[in-house]
């Protein structure tokens, strides 16, 4: 479409099919018969549009109404970030909402629209916590993940020749987040001990089961996970144990919450949710994905990363500092590229606050007030109209240089553009900058130790070999 030429206006194509029956059939396509990417791509192809009416899971009986207008390109997708146009009340998980029994009876911040009074208070609490703990992130990460890599080396040397990074990361990320945010390792808590990651994973599953597949046979898994909610009482003891840790470890943050006008109880449930669901749930997915992508990219990228990382650390006197990290342009680009291809949260939702117009690359569409808008992020962030012929490929240096940085506005993983920042007035992830920092720190730890490494990627990421660094540019600290 030429610049300045109005886009043709079209009705939104697509079909919701026969009530109930089509929604169930579409759910089976989504999880078992087609898979997520093919589910959306096939419907965009069928109707010749990247804005299309479809059903989304979980459907009956979990969701009252599975009908959405799907936004499947980089141009239409960002309307979901505009809280002047879309309402974000109770749409964090989409067309269904988990029971508030799983969050202490509270609608936590993720489910609040910015227009609701407590949204600003809770988000300010989260933003302030991150600022207050900023000096802890680098040393605490290095301590925890340095120990993880020690374990990797031990397991590789033990004769098996493999080390399950995914499993190690599940345990290490939980320890790291608790210590980084609150100064107290969860494993030191009498309520959790070493069982924290398991309790957290169960609590996450109880909320995300309708959007999850565990690899069980369809005839068993679909009615078990996608039809009716899992009973909250089955994990109430696990949640109480998690809550007890936060009530004790986060005492300073809870004091600050009272100063913002929040009760300690509501603040504690929100800190638990933000830490376990948002941060831990995100790192469980993201860090293995970064490792997998970099392993598959091969030795040439490894050489470039090692050279950049070691040079920046050497210039900082052998220390890993925030200033040194800012000099690592390729390292940061690799993290952004992993987030572009494999966003930890793939779905975004919003309900139209009024009649509005949405534009794709090719047409304009009228949306009625109250319609549910849905974005499948991988379609948007792999849009070939923006990222060209390599849109589906991992290109580590994609965001290097002035031209590369222009593409950052199309990186949406944080529920906002990468060029924007979270505030109390929007729904962008409060930990946006921390996530990119942690991704870089993982690469720094890897390439200060190793010249290269190999890994197998499937449902788990398994490290199969490491080549120790031939030179060292860092004075490693505990």
Curated annotation (Swiss-Prot):
Sites where the protein binds (13S)-hydroperoxy-(9Z,11E,15Z)-octadecatrienoate: 278
Swiss-Prot/TrEMBL induction comment: By jasmonic acid, salicylic acid, hydrogen peroxide, copper and by the protein phosphatases cantharidin, endothall and okadaic acid in light-grown seedling leaves. By incompatible rice blast fungus M.grisea. Not induced by red (R) light or abrasion in dark-grown seedlings.
EC number from the UniProt entry: 4.2.1.92
Annotated keywords: Fatty acid biosynthesis, Fatty acid metabolism, Heme, Iron, Lipid biosynthesis, Lipid metabolism, Lyase, Metal-binding, Oxylipin biosynthesis
Coiled coil: none
Residues annotated to bind heme b: 88, 119, 123, 427, 429
Pathway: Lipid metabolism; oxylipin biosynthesis
Tissue-by-tissue expression: Weakly expressed in roots, shoots, leaves and flowers.
Record field: catalytic activity: (13S)-hydroperoxy-(9Z,11E,15Z)-octadecatrienoate = (9Z,13S,15Z)-12,13-epoxyoctadeca-9,11,15-trienoate + H2O
Similarity section: Belongs to the cytochrome P450 family.
Function: Involved in the biosynthesis of jasmonic acid, a growth regulator that is implicated also as a signaling molecule in plant defense. Converts 13-hydroperoxylinolenic acid to 12,13-epoxylinolenic acid.
Protein name according to UniProt: Allene oxide synthase 2
Organism name: Oryza sativa subsp. japonica
Gene symbol of the encoding locus: CYP74A2
